[in-house]
């Protein structure tokens, strides 16, 4: 039995947007992030990361994200799964400034 289908895929879009923002905040490329996921035990490919990030853009076709990929990306980025699947309170630091820094926008510290 199939459940209702959502063409919006809001959580998958949030993951793509959050991965892109966290990656940029940390100054790492998509290829570097893909390589880092190999150390988590579940590799997420460069092309998968590209598709996730592109799908987060307004008007872009949605792309479903696998739970295992979300877990691996969260570990590689040093955040929780919850931080990847929800929209952050602060878009400047994604509610997770780098260690030793404070966000100038919201004041959050690591």
Language-model features, listed with the residues they occupy:
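DNA major-groove recognition helix of helix-turn-helix
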Residues: 37, 53, 69, 77, ...
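Short, charged recognition helix plus adjacent turn
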Residues: 2, 9, 82-110
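A short, Lys/Arg-rich alpha-helix, primarily the initiator
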Residues: 1-35
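Short alpha-helical DNA-recognition segment
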Residues: 27-58
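Residues that mark the N-terminal boundary/hinge immediately upstream of a DNA-recognition element
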Residues: 18, 29, 66-69, 80
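Short, basic-rich loop-to-helix N-cap that marks the start of a DNA-contacting helix
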Residues: 43-47, 56-75
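Hydrophobic alpha-helical segments that drive targeting, anchoring, or assembly
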Residues: 11-13, 60-66, 81, 85
């Amino acid at each position: 039995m199939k459940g209702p289908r959502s063409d919006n895929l809001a959580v998958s879009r949030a993951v793509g947007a959050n991965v892109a923002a966290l990656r940029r905040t940390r100054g790492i490329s998509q290829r570097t992030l893909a390589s880092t996921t190999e150390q988590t035990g579940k590799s997420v490919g460069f092309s998968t990361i590209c598709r996730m990030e592109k799908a987060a853009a307004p008007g872009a076709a949605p792309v479903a994200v696998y739970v295992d990929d979300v877990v691996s990306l969260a570990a590689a980025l040093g955040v929780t799964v919850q931080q990847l699947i929800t929209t952050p309170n602060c878009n400047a630091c994604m509610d997770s400034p780098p260690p030793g820094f404070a966000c100038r926008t919201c004041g959050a510290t690591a």
